[in-house]
């Protein structure tokens, strides 16, 4: 694990921290595809990361932000909302509540994110367009959990194709905000665990060195670092870290047992100790959506069912 003792020697401190804004601006101005890992229900971390992305210092460095928490079926609706048109909260909620992985987006930080983008777009020289790359579909057409799983497995490919299409049209860099495991550049070294290629693996193949992946610190412990910032993973103190040292919940088998950290991600974003906010108290779902979410309970797993029931009760 990362050394959190007060006796850690200065020589064991991580080096080369870059301020997030400087890092992002440099990569985006060079035309890179910057993929930032997101941890579901880590709302404070989400808000800090997106605060950096929406900062005025990055105005003009990118115009398109690709996200996974939205069904592409509702792209036009989101475009209208972000451009300032009148859209009710119940209508806008279709963007993330009609997502394949909607239980992951029930925390209000995701819906509030669109409000924040709309607000900053009113003052930006280059407004941010949010691109929903999850395959377009209707829940009415999903009759079995296997159909949902098949659709979910298509998300990485759809995201990679969407980003490739945009980069071919525009010289600006592109930002991708997606679940952290999706940004990994390699398949598991234990082959039987690789169900399909991650977005990161596809992006590495398509964009080469122009693909830059940034893993966020999602542990409740301190990192042996002198300051918050983004650290390159090719330095010795990070390069040899195990994948298991990046995640709070340890699987029984390390799927990347023989892979160095710098082969998985290019940089590590440290914003201090983080915790998952799983408390559903205060989460408000528009009434018209409660019945719809209840109808989907048979299609999701037990853990997701538990979260949904807590939110709609």
Q: Where in this protein do the model-derived segments appear?
A:
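Compositional signal for N-terminal targeting/processing segments
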Residues: 1-313
């Amino acid at each position: 694990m990362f050394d959190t003792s007060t006796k850690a020697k200065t020589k064991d401190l991580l080096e080369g921290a870059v301020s997030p804004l400087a890092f992002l601006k440099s990569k985006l101005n060079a035309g890179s595809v910057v993929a930032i890992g997101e941890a579901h229900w880590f709302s404070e971390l989400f808000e800090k990361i997106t605060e950096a992305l929406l900062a005025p210092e990055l105005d003009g460095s990118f115009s398109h932000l690709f996200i996974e928490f939205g069904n592409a079926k509702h792209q036009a609706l989101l475009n209208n909302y972000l451009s300032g048109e009148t859209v009710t909260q119940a209508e806008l909620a279709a963007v993330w509540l009609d997502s394949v992985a909607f239980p992951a987006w029930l925390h209000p930080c995701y819906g509030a994110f669109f409000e924040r983008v709309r607000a900053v777009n009113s003052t930006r020289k280059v407004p941010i367009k949010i691109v929903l790359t999850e395959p377009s579909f209707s829940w009415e057409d999903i009759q079995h959990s296997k159909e949902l799983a098949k659709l979910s497995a298509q998300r990485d490919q759809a995201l990679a194709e969407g980003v490739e299409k945009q980069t071919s049209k525009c010289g600006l860099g592109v930002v991708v905000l997606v679940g952290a495991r999706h940004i990994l550049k390699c398949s598991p070294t234990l082959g039987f665990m690789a169900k399909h290629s991650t977005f990161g693996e596809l992006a590495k193949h398509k964009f080469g060195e122009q693909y830059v992946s940034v893993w966020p610190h999602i542990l409740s412990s301190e990192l042996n670092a002198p300051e918050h910032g983004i650290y390159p993973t090719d330095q010795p103190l990070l390069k040899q870290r195990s994948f298991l040292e990046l995640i709070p919940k340890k699987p029984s088998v390390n799927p990347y047992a023989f892979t160095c950290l710098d082969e998985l991600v290019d940089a590590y974003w440290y914003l201090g100790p983080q915790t998952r906010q799983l408390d559903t108290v205060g989460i408000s779902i528009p009434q018209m959506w409660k019945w719809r979410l209840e109808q989907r309970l048979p299609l999701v797993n037990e853990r997701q069912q538990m979260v949904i029931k807590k939110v709609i009760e």
